[in-house]
C-alpha cells in the first residue's frame, strides 16, 4: 500500500519530532539512498533528489520534514542518515529484500549458480553494517544536525560479489544471467561521503572484500 507507506513514514516522523521538541532530545533517524533515484553519481546531499518509487519518495518527505524542523529549532540536534546498500549480520529475516550479498551467498552455499540481471555489471555502493553502526555512534557524539550519506564512496558490481564469494567459499560458480523484469531499477549508485567525513568524522573501515569476509563468520 503506497499511501500507507507515505503516511507511516512521514506522519511517524512528525510525531517523533513533537516528542523530541518536548523532551529537548537528540534524534537520529534512517533515511535512504532511494531519495536519489537514478540521479548521476556520485550522489550528494541536496542534489539530484528525484526518487522514482514510493519508498524513496517517503524517505525524501521525511528528510524535508526534518530539515524544516532543524531550521525552526536549531538548538535541537536532528540527524538523518541516508544508508546506501547495507549488508551484514541480522538481515536474514528480510527474505527477498535482504541484500544481494546475502541472496547470492545463499544460492552459492547451496551449490546453485548465482542469478543476476544481465550482465551483472550493475553497481552499488555496498556498506557493511559495522560501518553503519559506527556512523550512528558518531552521529550521537557530534553536536551537529543535518542529512548525511552513509556508504563507502565506492561502487562495486554484482559480478564482483560473485567473484569474492567464489574465492571465500572455494567454489567456481558462473552467474546465471536473466532479463531484469522491472521498469525502474537503479543501475548505479555511488555516494559522495564528504559531508559525513567532515562533520561526523565518518570513515568506512570495511571494503567489500573485508565486509563479506567478516559477514561469512556469522552465516
Residue locations for each model-derived region?
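Conserved Rossmann-fold NAD(P)-dependent oxidoreductase catalytic core, especially the SDR/UDP-sugar
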Residues: 14-54, 79
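Conserved active-site helix of classical SDR/Rossmann-fold NAD(P)-dependent CH-OH oxidoreductases
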Residues: 13-14, 60-67, 101-105, 134
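Active-site Tyr-X1-5-Lys
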Residues: 38-39, 50-79, 84, 108-110
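A hydrophobic alpha-helix adjacent to the NAD(P)-binding/active-site core of NAD(P)-dependent oxidoreductases
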Residues: 5-6
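The catalytic Tyr-centered alpha-helix of NAD(P)H-dependent dehydrogenases
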Residues: 51-58, 83, 93, 97-101, ...
